[in-house]
């Protein structure tokens, strides 16, 4: 059950990567097998829309070097980049035009080529080294609804398509690159891929991109895990030859080895592939069927079984917030909200606020409009968040959302208290690009100023026409950039103390008389002796605990060995039983496939006769009804032949006797149908 999720740490390069530099470049040949699209097309204009109601601005600033804007690059900490949102010219007002977070819009694709593989048809290889997490290609095709997806899946299967190119974009929406798409459609599957799929919000539309999971060498095939969000009508053998190969790809739900929910949901929920694998194994052992919600590709039962944990790393917050900003699935949102509500670490809470946190909470208050209990928990969490400026609250309009809750008696008190708290926050003018370009050297100043990475809780504000650093939680303003030391320990650690009617500072040193000096010296020696005794006691305690743990481990190991010896014979018997069941299933599949193939041949046999025999009835009913009758007659005749002999195949040519019998059946069927139609018309 491999998962190609967006990694926080790139995978190491394998010791022996296979290169295909000697294979002929088949790109031009491959382009002739489909219609190339420059961007996705939509069968309905609302398909592919992001679930965010408004565009999310980042807080980066222009950073021009060599006439190129380097803002929002890989190392910038851009909040849009962290939450998988692309910046858009004229909408992101501070980072400037043509920043580095516009890879989909600029089509900054990696240099790739199509080549012929041994068993998998066409494949895609890298024409240069590709670094970890680098954007490779957008998966482009026709964005269709779920109803169209199901129709096309049947249609392509009937037309005998060997390869499928469906990808789930979001709940109820799919990208179909089968007949219209781009070169990314030729990226093959691997159970141990070097690339992963990630979904980004680009100018209000959800886009699907392929990114490097690790460094990919020039000539190496680019692969990702189809079992994440890709669909096909019929299960196909997998030829990736990886040690962890699952054997098949495609089919109704990507086989039982497919992931239990989309990769970005799993990442945000903190689900590891091993957890999914263990759950699937347990369900199979109980003989229970594993299924997903058809429209959302989520196994509800599995998600309900998860024990959610708080966000403990920046990457956890990034993944949770990116999904919350993209979706409006109430079930998944409730689970991700639970992770946020469990997060009490102040560092993580600052990160939540930073990544469009107030906009996200405003969205959740609306999504759970009828769930007062959830709204109450959100209000309590908002009250516990660290203090910031009021700018984010106003721009997200969450204050208006909270004001609307004053009408609910159960929430009135909490909403009122939260609004009162927010009213104490200060509002500052946002630093805009124009404020720094009034002088000839203004741009260089703002570039240096905005490159400063601020410690936790600090913001950049604009006061009296100049930039300042502000910590709302500690009510501190600074002209020079703050450091972590300033965040952790203010300059004055203790307040001034009253002395003889005035004040003195405890941090001011005063000379000691000899008696006081000796007294302090004795106190220090006593304290050091006490600390030494405590450390010795602690060492003895740790040693006893270590011995006890080792004793317990030895006992557990002996028990494990004993249990293993007892179960060895049982495992052998289970293995033999499993091999027997596998052989029986293989035989049943062979028989089922054979019967289906014979039925298809009989359908084709009768389909070349029946339409011509009933076309004379075209004067009595419309063409569509005639076609429907032809299909029904073909199915009936095929069924009759299979009942006689399920192994018999139709003859190569239609005999006169067979044609006569078919003609008699068609005439009888159509006459009865016309009689029923006439009787129905008379009764009206």
Swiss-Prot record:
Domain notes: The AWS and SET domains are necessary for transcription repression.
Coiled-coil residue spans: 518-594
Main localization, broad class: nucleus
Name this protein carries in UniProt: Histone-lysine N-methyltransferase, H3 lysine-36 specific
Signal peptide: none
Composition-biased stretches (Basic and acidic residues): 506-521, 568-586
Disulfide bonds: none
Natural source organism: Eremothecium gossypii (strain ATCC 10895 / CBS 109.51 / FGSC 9923 / NRRL Y-1056)
Task of the protein: Histone methyltransferase that trimethylates histone H3 'Lys-36' forming H3K36me3. Involved in transcription elongation as well as in transcription repression.
InterPro entries recorded: AWS_dom, Post-SET_dom, Set2_fungi, SET2_Histone-Lys_MeTrsfase, SET_dom, SET_dom_sf, SRI, SRI_sf
Keyword list, A-Z: Chromosome, Coiled coil, Methyltransferase, Nucleus, Repressor, S-adenosyl-L-methionine, Transcription, Transcription regulation, Transferase
Region span, Disordered: 479-521, 568-595
One example GO MF annotation: histone H3K36 methyltransferase activity
Domain Post-SET span(s) in chain numbering: 234-250
Catalytic activity of the protein: L-lysyl(36)-[histone H3] + 3 S-adenosyl-L-methionine = N(6),N(6),N(6)-trimethyl-L-lysyl(36)-[histone H3] + 3 S-adenosyl-L-homocysteine + 3 H(+)
GO CC annotations, alphabetized: chromatin; cytosol; nucleus
Location of the AWS domain: 53-108
Record family assignment: Belongs to the class V-like SAM-binding methyltransferase superfamily. Histone-lysine methyltransferase family. SET2 subfamily.
SMART domains assigned to the protein according to its UniProt record, in alphabetical order: AWS, PostSET, SET
Domain SET: 110-227
Gene Ontology biological process terms in this record: ascospore formation; DNA-templated transcription elongation; DNA-templated transcription termination; methylation; negative regulation of antisense RNA transcription; negative regulation of reciprocal meiotic recombination; regulation of DNA-templated DNA replication initiation; regulation of DNA-templated transcription
Enzyme Commission numbers on file: 2.1.1.359
Location in or out of the cell: Nucleus; Chromosome
PANTHER family per the UniProt record, alphabetical: SET DOMAIN PROTEINS
Domain WW, chain residue ranges per copy: 452-484
